[in-house]
């Protein structure tokens, strides 16, 4: 943030980091940019989730300091457990989405991933929009269609030697294109 205040270009921007770490804002911005998303509901009410989305549902934390991914609830007791866990003992709301297909989580490195074509397109579009170089994307595959559901930071222990080579190659490419890339 200090570099941004001084007028330096920072990738990703503080705004993009904050927005992408809050699932409802991530989904809203993604949908506005044409990235496929599913309907979502931000609430702390089990009753509202059941009434509006029914089962099964995917639950994401709204609190940006919880990086537990998501929880799937197929019944009321699982939904209560998910809200208690991801809502920090019901102190925070959660973001609920209908589960219509299969959940898939994968690494996105500078918008590249080793997935099917639809997932690669989502990865590229998310990178174009938020400029988050390293993240884990959570998507839902419904038939042949893929929908963005969430994003979370990658932990260092999740990066393989191959990933590190990809990162080095991408940084070298950015530098060759004349863009300043500070770490």
Residue ranges and their predicted role:
Residues 49-59:
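Acidic/histidine-enriched active-site and ligand-binding environments that engage anionic O-linkages
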Residues 1-48:
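Conserved N-proximal alpha/beta basic substrate-recognition cap immediately N-terminal to
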Residues 37-45, 60-73, 164-167:
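Short, basic, helix/turn surface patches
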């Amino acid at each position: 943030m200090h570099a941004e205040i001084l007028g330096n270009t920072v990738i990703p921007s503080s705004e993009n980091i904050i927005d992408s770490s809050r699932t409802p804002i991530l989904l809203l911005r993604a949908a506005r940019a044409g990235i496929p998303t599913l309907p979502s509901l931000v609430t702390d009410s089990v009753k509202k989730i059941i009434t509006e989305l029914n089962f099964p549902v995917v639950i994401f934390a709204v609190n940006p300091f919880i990086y537990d991914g998501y929880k799937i609830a197929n019944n009321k007791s699982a939904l209560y457990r998910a809200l208690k866990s991801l809502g920090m003992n019901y102190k925070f709301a959660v973001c609920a989405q209908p589960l219509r297909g299969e959940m898939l989580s994968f690494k996105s490195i500078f918008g590249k991933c080793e997935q099917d074509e639809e997932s690669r397109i989502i990865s590229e579009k998310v990178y174009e929009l938020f400029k988050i170089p390293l993240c884990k994307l959570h998507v839902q595959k419904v038939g042949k269609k893929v929908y963005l559901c969430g994003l979370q930071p990658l932990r260092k222990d999740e990066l393989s030697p191959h990933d590190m080579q990809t990162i080095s190659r991408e940084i070298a490419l950015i530098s060759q294109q004349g863009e300043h890339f500070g770490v």
